[in-house]
Amino acid sequence: MQTTGALLISPALIRSCTRGLIRPVSASFLSRPEIPSVQPSYSSGPLQVARREFQTSVVSRDIDTAAKFIGAGAATVGVAGSGAGIGTVFGSLIIGYARNPSLKQQLFSYAILGFALSEAMGLFCLMVAFLILFAM
């Protein structure tokens, strides 16, 4: 069995571990620009501009890519819903025409309106999927 003295943690260790947790997010993710100690000569070439960039690892880029593909796949499900909606609209048109043939013109205009709305929602879902893939 271990003694309780081995399980105790020194206060210096706690301070050094929690110092990284207290830092602001911008200081944690942004790299600091390198400041040269020697002044460059102006005749040696173009001046280097210090830039701050996000530090991203390969793992986080892979996670971002996977999230993009999952989001685009979820948005594409709406296109299948559009196909089901169009089938429902024209199936209802046939049933309505079989029940009351005298309303043929009014039923057809409603069916065209339902087709247009269902198709618009399918195209909107497809557009969102392409935006997720190629614009983000």
Swiss-Prot record:
Subcellular location: Mitochondrion membrane
Site keyed Reversibly protonated during proton transport: positions: 119
Catalytic activity from the UniProt record: H(+)(in) = H(+)(out)
One of the GO biological process terms: proton motive force-driven ATP synthesis
GO CC term (a single one): mitochondrial membrane
N6,N6,N6-trimethyllysine: residues carrying this PTM: 104
Transit peptide: 1-61
Alphabetic keyword roster: CF(0), Hydrogen ion transport, Ion transport, Lipid-binding, Membrane, Methylation, Mitochondrion, Transit peptide, Transmembrane, Transmembrane helix, Transport
InterPro entries documented for this protein: ATP_synth_F0_csu, ATP_synth_F0_csu_DDCD_BS, ATP_synth_F0_csu_sf, ATPase_proteolipid_c-like_dom, F/V-ATP_Csub_sf
Membrane topology: Multi-pass membrane protein
One Pfam family linked to the record: ATP-synt_C
Spans traversing the lipid bilayer: 77-97, 112-132
GO function term, MF aspect, one: lipid binding
Main subcellular location of this protein, as a coarse class: mitochondrion
Family: Belongs to the ATPase C chain family.
Note: There are three genes which encode the ATP synthase proteolipid and they specify precursors with different import sequences but identical mature proteins.
Assembly with partners or alone: Homooctamer; the c-ring consists of eight c subunits forming a circle, and each subunit adopts a hairpin shape. Component of the ATP synthase complex composed at least of ATP5F1A/subunit alpha, ATP5F1B/subunit beta, ATP5MC1/subunit c (homooctomer), MT-ATP6/subunit a, MT-ATP8/subunit 8, ATP5ME/subunit e, ATP5MF/subunit f, ATP5MG/subunit g, ATP5MK/subunit k, ATP5MJ/subunit j, ATP5F1C/subunit gamma, ATP5F1D/subunit delta, ATP5F1E/subunit epsilon, ATP5PF/subunit F6, ATP5PB/subunit b, ATP5PD/subunit d, ATP5PO/subunit OSCP.
Disease: This protein is the major protein stored in the storage bodies of animals or humans affected with ceroid lipofuscinosis (Batten disease).
PANTHER family with a match to the protein in the record: ATP SYNTHASE F(0) COMPLEX SUBUNIT C1, MITOCHONDRIAL, ATP SYNTHASE LIPID-BINDING PROTEIN, MITOCHONDRIAL
Entry protein name: ATP synthase F(0) complex subunit C1, mitochondrial
Originating species: Ovis aries
